[in-house]
């Protein structure tokens, strides 16, 4: 049986518990403390975090050996990839259960180490970051999205950001702020859009504007202004980027990040 509710006593009947609250470490730790109290001994306890360190989450329980990450990609009923995340104390049998669950659900389970963003989001972040660089360098969101859908992507990165919500990436960036290398190139365009309340489709505006859920084709002057200001602050003379350059830079960013991953 599958239960989706907050009746904690039902956890005593569960062989596997999956937490799926929003990406806030303190909130997840509090949920796991409650799960630890109510779940039966030997139950597998999983977090659906997409990028947080799962070890502090596991440490909130008295049984970190039973905790692992099961990162389902959104929308979970469609996306095949399932990251099975190994914590420092995760027992081998618990990992085997996670992999078996993925196969049972007809997913593609991939075992990954406990690094920020795991595999999929780490590569995607490198891709998105390069696309943000291209905004500062002279491209517009529609230039980048059109070039990459032309390469075969179902959606471009800025359309994806609007669909999923810009605040998701914003929250992740704020979580990384304390450890970010000050020498690293950082593009604040997304931050400024979020501060202006432009969180994507759900607020009617993000990188693009929307009316009744449909993207407005007209150029968004507000977004153009934010991008032009970002370029000027960095001293960049904007230039047109050909689709081939956009495609090449995006792909090479992903290839480079993949080469740095040690599972």
Set out the residue ranges of the language-model regions.
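N-terminal glycine-rich phosphate-binding loop for ADP-containing cofactors
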Residues: 1-261
